Amino acid sequence: MFRVLNDDVYSPAEIQQQNPLAFGKASSLFTDNRSANDQCETGENVRESGQDHVKRPMNAFIVWSRERRRKVALENPKMQNSEISKQLGYEWKRLTDAEKRPFFEEAQRLLAIHRDKYPDYKYRPRRKTKRQQKLLPADSSILCKQMHVETLQPFTYRNGCAKTTCSRMESQLSLSQSVTITNSFFQKEHHNSWTNLGHNRVTLSTQISADFPFYQSLQPGLSCAYFQY
């Protein structure tokens, strides 16, 4: 039994000879984890180092609110940060110029130090993330078409199931098409009949006007006898 246990224990060299790919993956994972742990211990940022980023110099309000915010947070632990900011802004507006003067002087001193330390500093505000663009007219038309198709064919067919619904809808569509064709045919025939009637009226009036001298030449007695049945 001890022999079997001893045979199961392999050295790293034997593991590398048997499966070099697995050994390489395990070693790479070990080195990656070690480097990540080293970064966490040293406090390095993986995404971006803080050496290139330069903070803006504090203004008078920030100099004053830095200590005041701590006091308000300690006095009201349940108050949210947004509510604290509103309260600090209201209190800052109520301060007189004499009360604000020391904070303005401190801000000027910090600004001079900042200029000496970073002479080429330029404030570059961060760009705000753009909101999602609204649907274009083309996109909205495509959505409308898709909705129309979905209303006409709400079911998916499997092995010939639920085809009666499609046949009914197709029959309704064909019936509506036939009704529209029939209506257009009757409208066309009605229009043609009215045009023919108008043409016949014009022809009759022209014929009567042409025969009018002949009717005038007839004598009264002859005219009555001529038109007897």
From Swiss-Prot:
SUPFAM superfamilies: HMG-box (SSF47095). GO terms for cellular component: cytoplasm; nuclear speck; nucleus. Pfam families: HMG_box. GO terms for biological process: cell differentiation; male sex determination; sex differentiation. Acetylation of Lys-130 contributes to its nuclear localization and enhances its interaction with KPNB1. Deacetylated by HDAC3. InterPro entries: HMG_box_dom, HMG_box_dom_sf, SRY, SRY-related_HMG-box_TF-like. One of its GO terms (molecular function) is calmodulin binding. Keywords: Acetylation, Activator, Calmodulin-binding, Cytoplasm, Differentiation, DNA-binding, Nucleus, Repressor, Sexual differentiation, Transcription, Transcription regulation. It is found in: Nucleus speckle; Cytoplasm; Nucleus. Residues 54-122 bind DNA. The keyword Cytoplasm applies. Transcriptional regulator that controls a genetic switch in male development. It is necessary and sufficient for initiating male sex determination by directing the development of supporting cell precursors (pre-Sertoli cells) as Sertoli rather than granulosa cells. Involved in different aspects of gene regulation including promoter activation or repression. Binds to the DNA consensus sequence 5'-[AT]AACAA[AT]-3'. SRY HMG box recognizes DNA by partial intercalation in the minor groove and promotes DNA bending. Also involved in pre-mRNA splicing. Interacts with CALM, EP300, HDAC3, KPNB1, ZNF208 isoform KRAB-O, PARP1, SLC9A3R2 and WT1. The interaction with EP300 modulates its DNA-binding activity. The interaction with KPNB1 is sensitive to dissociation by Ran in the GTP-bound form. Interaction with PARP1 impaired its DNA-binding activity. Belongs to the SRY family. This is Sex-determining region Y protein. It comes from Alces alces cameloides.
